[in-house]
Amino acid sequence: MKKLMTLLTGGLLLAAVQLSAQTAAAKPVIMTTDGEEIRAALVELTQSGDFRYAESLKDGSPKLSIRKNRVRWAWIPKPEEITKADNLLKNKKYDEAATAFAATAKSFGPLGWEPYSKLRQAEALDASGKQSEAIKVLETLKDYANVSPRNEADLSAAYELLVKFYANIKAWDKGLELSKKLMYAGDAAAVSALFARGDILSARASETNSQDDRRDAFNDYAQISLLFPKSSRAAEATFRAYQTLTVLNDARAQIFADKLKKDYPKSDYAKQL
């Protein structure tokens, strides 16, 4: 798979992606407001924000155009610039990574990569001790409208991270409000929403010693454990449910301990029992 990004002197910001014909699922996609799905070989974004695309590599440079107000969302495979920013973050070059992700959020945001870029930018900022800046970055996603199946998980992860930051600064109401917003998305978002709500309720309970908050947090973790057993986070949720009930001196804690050992015996959480 080859990926091409060029800045055209004629005033076009080209985010073009060349893909093998065998990898149809990884082709750039433009979803129009009337529900038409356009699978392209090349996609470019003009400086005015409109889209140009080519349906086949044989067509040469993109000639077909579509106005931005007719695009519900667009997506291209991960650009090389984002992979480079990932490596900066992985190598703990946090300031450089934050700057790089800020740039990719701007350049590739309309092409589906704004949630991912801002999530990673916030992680880099937080790692360098700039949590307040990280919060501001994530808050720009609160009204994000270009949600697609390609970036929904990244958006949910960004919201969940923002809820955790709100918990850190004791902005309980903001965190709970945002977790409610997550509830109305798909299953993956629902798991994130339940975790986010459970975590902020647990954090508030630690501060206020509210048993009601602890019980509500348990309900959130238990829902993930029982309703989404195949989720990659089910073991963690089961452990959190066990922990919360233990703090509440509730005998049902053993039920979740047994479930954790039975259903997720190789998980790190089962090893902590």
Report each predicted region and the residues it spans.
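Bacterial N-terminal signal peptides that target proteins for export
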Residues: 1-9
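Intrinsic disorder/low-complexity segments enriched in polar/small residues
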Residues: 3-4, 19, 23
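Bacterial N-terminal signal peptides
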Residues: 8-16
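Compositionally biased alpha-helical segments
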Residues: 21-148, 153, 157-169, 173, ...
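Terminal, low-structured helical/coil segments at or just beyond the last alpha-helical repeat
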Residues: 212-215, 235, 239, 245-273
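Amphipathic alpha-helical interaction surfaces
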Residues: 227-230, 266
